[in-house]
Amino acid sequence: MQIYLAVTPAEAQEASRFRCSLAHVAYCIGPDSTLLRQNLLLQTRGGLLSVTDRGAPFIASPERLSAAALRECGRRSYGGVLLDFEQPPAPDRLAFAETLARRLSPRPVYVPESYAAASGAIPLICTAISGGNFVQRLQEAAAGRDRAGGLALDVQRLRMDFTLPAQSGEGRPLSGRELQDLL
């Protein structure tokens, strides 16, 4: 099982002591389908390239953006890409995910579950659920996939207090001390 720890450039050096692969949360989509990078250490190598679409413009050229991501993967020896898309699925983002997955293959391209329709990409299934059966949830997510190993888990460490009934599935965040007091 491969585990990636998502880190910003400021967290990368400290996180490297955990001896696991890192997903470098340092990239975003810029104007004219460019790939923009935050300040990374020169020696940053391996792990995943993580791209956000927060505040990103329309992707006019999925090919151009894919080529930029491919070059960066080669330069930094990244083993794949995590598309940390926050926007709802849109044709330009789906086209980028599919183009990148095709060009980067056999290296993985991970996408949010809402982008699971992107051919060749691996959907991330969020493990932070507030009810139901987790095994059933995974079985349902896997049912639509065409190959084994076609899912990845997005594990988030959360501490929340839920007032029942929890209609929204969102609870009130708890500090470590508040959780201990409840236990």
Give, region by region, the residue ranges found by the protein language model.
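Secreted glycan hydrolases and related glycan-binding modules that recognize and/or cleave
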Residues: 1-183
